[in-house]
Amino acid sequence: MLITNTEEKIIKKEMEKLKNRIVLTVFTDFITNKSEKERRRTIESERVLGILNKLEELSQGKLNIKELSIKENQDKTEMYNIRNIPTIMFQSSENNNNNNKELIRYTANLEGNQLIPFLKSVLYYSGVNPFYKDQIITNLKNIKRSEITLFISQTCAYCPQVIPIVNSFAIISNGKIKVEIIDVNAHPDIAMKHKISGVPHTIINKKKHLYGLFSPQDLLDNLTMGKRDFSGMYS
């Protein structure tokens, strides 16, 4: 994956802001040859892994990328029900066992306008707080376990603004709210199945739809079903 000088400077600047050590797991389709010295992957997996490796390189040891193969690690593939590759997994860091809680499932390209929102999400994952953290924590008692699916594309003007919002909800709620990010161009079959005609398109618990741009407060209203507690800071 060829990263421009400008992108590398952006990555370096953002990775310097990492707070705690974190691990990202990425599922690809690599096959190790007989000498166990070389791995072959599809172009899509190579592109995503190239960016992730650059993040790891510039993280000063705070980010570790763990690569698993749907072909060579079938137990993990089945455990996490991996359907598409590459898939990046953000998981709960509370423990180090083999069943870490899933927070975010990222099946999207990291290039172009999707790079910055991904970097922001990584920072939140490391412990950097979004300004609306208190609102989310205050309202967790009013939110049932939820799943958010966000459909995006590289040419979408508003997607970079909503990606960090939904991801921060998953991270701050420690998985009470699970998020999946799907690129409609990379996965047109999934977009067609859900009848996605424009992006960003957000689906909450497989029934509530948000079209276009929204704020953290808008998402809270939908997750709490209108019962939002306004006592939190920045309400």
Give the residues covered by each predicted segment.
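Structural micro-motif
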Residues: 74-94, 101, 193-205
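Thiol-based oxidoreductase modules, predominantly thioredoxin-like and allied folds used
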Residues: 60-73, 174-190
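Non-catalytic, surface beta->alpha helical segment in thiol-disulfide oxidoreductase systems
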Residues: 90-128, 203-235
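N-terminal beta-loop-helix "entrance" segment that forms/cooperates
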Residues: 34-42, 76-78, 190-193
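Acidic, two-metal ion nucleic-acid-processing modules in DNA metabolism proteins
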Residues: 47-60, 67-68, 103, 110-112, ...
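Positively charged, low-complexity, intrinsically disordered RNA-binding extensions
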Residues: 150, 173, 182, 197, ...
